[in-house]
Amino acid sequence: MALIQEMSYRIKMSDIDIHPSKTCFLMVSPDYSAVVTQHLSHSLSMDGEIFHIEAVNVPFPDEDSLDYKVDFAEKYIDWARKWDNFVLIEAGVIRGGNYTWITQQMELVSSNKYYTVALCENLGSKFKSDFVTLYYNDAVEDLHFWWEQPNNHWKFDSK
C-alpha cells in the first residue's frame, strides 16, 4: 500500500493535465494491476469524481500477443473518441514489451495525451514509464507481489 500511496503523491505533485471528466485510466494487465488502478482512481479523484477505468488484457510470456493487440486496437478506437487523456497503469513493468506495443498502437490511432505509470519497473526494461514508485534489477531479484500465487504461465523464460 505504501507504494500506491507514494505513486498517488507523485502524480498529484506533478500537476499533469488529468481530470475524471476527460481522462480514462487504462488498467494494463488487470490480474496484477487492478488493486493499484482502483486505489489510484479513488485517491486521485477530483471534484467528487473518480476516474473511469478500462481493462487492457495482455499476454503472458507463453502466449501469442496477436489476439490481445487486435482486441485493444478495436476498443481503443472507441475510447479515443470519448476521452482526451489516458493514464496507463501497471503494477510491474518487467521487460516493457506490453507498454511498447500498447503506446505504439495508441499513437497510430490518435494524438490523445497519455501518461504511463508503473508501481515497480525493472531497470532493464526497454520502456521507461513516466511515473515509477520503485525501480528494481531483475538480475538481482524477481518482481513478486504479496498477493501472487504460483502461475504456470510464468514458468516460460524468454530472457
Residue ranges and their predicted role:
Residues 1-159:
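PRPP-associated nucleotide enzymes
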